[in-house]
C-alpha cells in the first residue's frame, strides 16, 4: 500500500518521484534518469528544438507522470493528515501544474500538511494541551495565540475539562493604540477564535463564491452572468472553512502536549491507561488559567498589543510555562513584544523535546523487556523483585485520581523511598565486583546518573522531570550496546526500576 513514507523514501535519491504499477498494484519509485532521459530533458529547454515531435511527446509524458504522482501523493497525505492538511499542502506546495514531485516538494508538502493537521504525539490523548497560533504578518495582521487545556479521561462527560485561554482587547484598536493598556476580554472557545481571525470582507467573498457556485450547479454554467462566474472563482483557501453553525473561520496552527500522569488514546479505549512521565502539569496550568481570567475581571490584568506580558501571545505562553514548559526548553523573552510567531516557535521546541523524551522512555521500556529473554537474568531479577514486593502502580493510580488519603499517601511515599534505597544498594552491589579497568565510560555515566537521580518525597515536579530525563537518556545510550554479562543486564534493569520510582513520586507530586 502506498503511503507518505514511500514518497519520502523515493524522493531521497534527488530524482523526481513517479507512480507506476503492475498486477500487484501501484508502486512509488524514483524516475529513471539515463542518457536518453537526460538528453530529452536538456532538449526540452532549447527554444529551437523543444517543439520537435519527439521532444514534445517526452515533455507531455513527463507532465502526465508528474500529475499522476501528485494526485496519489495528495491522497496519501489525506489519509495521514486529513483532507484539510492535504488541501493545504496542495494549495501551498504544489504551485505549478505538472511540476516534478522532487525531494524539496515532497518535504515542503509534508511539512505543510503536518502544520495544518497539528504537531505532536499527544493529539489522540484524552489529557492534552493545545497551543494554537495564527501567523503574525505585522501590525495590520497581528495574528493571535491561544491555549486550551483538555481532560476527557473520565467516562462521565460531565466531568470533562475544557479550559480555553484567549486574550483579546475589549474594543477595536486604532492605529495609535498599540501601546495603550485597555480593558481585556477572554473568549471561551477555539471556534470563536477562528471566527475572529477572518475578516468580514473575506467572509463576504466566501459566501458570495459559495452561493454563485451553488447557483451555477443548479442552473447550468451557460445561464450564469459575468458577476456570478467571477464570484464562483473565489474558493476558500487552506484553513478557511465553515463550522457547524455555518460561520466562516480560519483554522490555527496547532501544537499538542501531553499532560503528566495516567493517560490513554481516545481512539482505543480498550488499551490500559499508561503513565506519561514527560509532559505538562495540568493542575498548575488550570490554576494559572483561572488566575488570568480572574485578573481580567478584577482589572488587575489589562490588554496591551505591543507588550511582553499582556498581549495574546504572552498570556498563552504564561499558562504554558506555568505547566512546566521550561523544564524542557529554556524560555527567552522577546526584546520588545511577544508575538504569535515567536510563541509558536517556542511551543514547537517544547513539544519536540517532550515527544523525544517520551519516545526514548518507550524505547527503554521495550529494550529492558528484551533483557528478560535470558533465563538467568529473568530468574535473578524475579528474585530481587519478590524480595522487595513494592509496586509503584497502586500509588500512582490513587495519587493521580486524588483518591488516596493523606495518611495512605505518606505511607506509600515512605514505602517508595525504601524501595529507592533498595534499588540503589542492589545497583551498587552489582557494580562493586567490576574493577576500574573493566568499567567503561558508559558504566561510569550510568552509575553517576543512578546516584544523582534517585528520587525522594522532597522532589517537586521540576526536580523529578530533570532526574527522569537524565536517567532515561543515560540508560537509553547504555542500551545501544548488548550487555556483556548478566550483571550488566541486571544493572540496566535496576536503572529501569529507578525510573519506575520516579513515576511514582511524580504521580504524588502532581496530585499534591
Curated annotation (Swiss-Prot):
Domain of life of the source: Bacteria
GO CC annotation, single: extracellular space
UniProt-annotated location(s): Secreted
Coiled coil: 347-377
Keyword match Membrane: no
Pfam families per the UniProt record, alphabetical: SicP-binding
Alphabetical list of InterPro entries matching this protein: Globular_prot_asu/bsu, SptP_N, SptP_N_sf
Function (record text): Plays a role in mediating bacterial evasion from the host autophagic pathway.
Protein name: Effector protein BopA
Species: Burkholderia pseudomallei (strain K96243)
Biological classification of the source: Bacteria, Pseudomonadati, Pseudomonadota, Betaproteobacteria, Burkholderiales
Gene name in the database record: bopA
